[in-house]
Amino acid sequence: MAMDEYLWMVILGFIIAFILAFSVGANDVANSFGTAVGSGVVTLRQACILASIFETTGSVLLGAKVGETIRKGIIDVNLYNNTVETLMAGEVSAMVGSAVWQLIASFLRFPISGTHCIVGATIGFSLVAIGTQGVQWMELVKIVASWFISPLLSGFMSGVLFVLIRMFILKKEDPVPNGLRALPVFYAATIAINVFSIMYTGAPVMGLVLPMWAIALISFGVALLFALFVWLFVCPWMRRKITGKLQKECALSRASDESLNKIQEVESPVFKELPGAKAHDDSTVPLTGSAADPSGTSESMSGGHHPRAPYGRALSMTHGTTKSPVSNGTFGFDGTARADGHVYHTVHKDSGLYKDLLHRIRDERPADGAPRQLRRNNSYTCYTAAICGLPGLATRRGDTPAPEDSEKLVADAVAYSRRRLRYDSYSSYCNAVAEAEIEAEEGGVEVRLAPPLAEPEPPRDDPADEEKEEKDSPEVHLLFHFLQVLTACFGSFAHGGNDVSNAIGPLVALWLIYEQGAVLQEAATPVWLLFYGGVGICTGLWVWGRRVIQTMGKDLTPITPSSGFTIELASAFTVVIASNIGLPVSTTHCKVGSVVAVGWIRSRKAVDWRLFRNIFVAWFVTVPVAGLFSAAIMALLIHGILPFV
């Protein structure tokens, strides 16, 4: 049968197939490296380089198996024996319908299934060409069932693996020993699955015919050798790297503390102890010397230590006060009157606030007379003023106001303090402390220690803490860093083997029909066509892949190296097994199922359920939408173009 008159259809098919492969790379490739980019173990550029290598390799070695299902398993091609040109037009229509919808979805950042697209598009053109009789419905039912089985199976496997990792590694006080012991097992499992997949599916391509037991033995042997290599070389290197990083962090922290301790307290009048203050604990910095108790008596502490509350918090700072004749009440330097006459504060020398404030006082001394609104610029001086209080208007012993003026005096002091707090600057704050110091030297201020407060309640467990997402420690991050890269490459390899058929399956059918002049397509899938599809997928990844990577790697749920490893390994294992038995499962479904399962286990609130709902709806919308586009193109070809060719 002369097929030269349909050469234009083959050329058009090659162009559309590349566009389809481009759309597959722009959308579905996020399933492979989206979690790796989201967890930060690889950059987007590194992900594109690795994916280009493994997507192409997987498409060549594993793509032929699934390509046969796409070409022959969805429709009965024997019904087109007498109308070969109709089947060729149908393959072109299927590619157009699938490509258009995937490009639209990629633009909208919707992660959809390329398998859904091509299956729906194939059914769409068949319904237009010969009606429902051309569709093998039982095969379609199996495919639809796999769409639900794959996310559930992948999610279950990811969940179980993550629970085990969390139980034996992440929850340990020191996760490094168990993590290093598990590394050879993790690497061996990943390598074994990968080698078995290549040998089982790719052996015919390489001209090898091996029994199942031989393939299993080879896979086990390679995995064992790789595990031995990891145990002898990778684990010691990883242990040294983790130890070195921890030691470096400790050294930097120690050096920072030592440099801060060299700053003399005299440079910080804010923390200058007033005359008459009792000796104080090293961990508590008094703003002033004392506070008056309600009875007007002084309380001193033996040994020069402040009372301390449980759980490491100081009960109070010493605080200077001036007596007021208002019914046994006093007001502190911050001008805040309390019923019991006491104001309690806490400032620790080892706190970051104290150290940062010392730096700011030393390096950023403002000019006198130029106060600034520190509250507006979030300076540490303002924060400390809010914590420690501002010295108010102290009164001398001889300047006792009349009883009717007492309340006004307290109110004026409070207003003055608030006004100073609002427009506080370093100079005004320190001047107020200096004024109080002069008053103390002249005997105008009584210096007393604040009596202890009632013991605070022990910290309660916040139920919301259980809902917070877990984060990997630096050691765990290093342990799973390379593992996630390896499993991401493994997932990319599996993705190339499974999803290249979505782009190249119709093109292979079109090429074989043109070459053989028959619809049976007896020849094997040409390797160069699989490579052509892999190149198209990589191009789509580089140009447009980052759009859906954002959705899969960050928007759906936060990813860490440990959770990303479990997601990659379990979902890739599911995809490879499905590819080896010829079942075109959706890598999107497998990855989304794993991401949601692990995210839900890590934290009930970590999953964006609204986004997951949209993705789930898109799974059902994709088939009819792609079928509708394909049916429209098919109707145009068989009724508007082919009759005139």
Swiss-Prot record:
It comes from Bos taurus (Bovine). InterPro entries: Phos_transporter (IPR001204). The keyword Ion transport applies. Residues 27-46, 108-109, 164-190, 235-475, 545-564, 603-614 are cytoplasmic. GO terms for biological process: phosphate ion transmembrane transport; positive regulation of bone mineralization. PANTHER family: PHOSPHATE TRANSPORTER, SODIUM-DEPENDENT PHOSPHATE TRANSPORTER 2. This is Sodium-dependent phosphate transporter 2. Homodimer. GO terms for cellular component: apical plasma membrane; brush border membrane; plasma membrane. It catalyses: 2 Na(+)(out) + phosphate(out) = 2 Na(+)(in) + phosphate(in). Signal peptide: none annotated. Glycans are attached at N81. The modification Phosphoserine is found at S253, S256, S259, S268, S316, S379. Residues 275-320, 448-471 are annotated as: Disordered. It is found in: Cell membrane; Apical cell membrane. It is a multi-pass membrane protein. The chain crosses the membrane at residues 6-26, 47-67, 87-107, 110-130, 143-163, 191-211, 214-234, 476-496, 524-544, 565-579, 587-602, 615-635. The keyword Transmembrane applies. Residues 1-5, 68-86, 131-142, 212-213, 497-523, 580-586, 636-645 are extracellular. Belongs to the inorganic phosphate transporter (PiT) (TC 2.A.20) family.
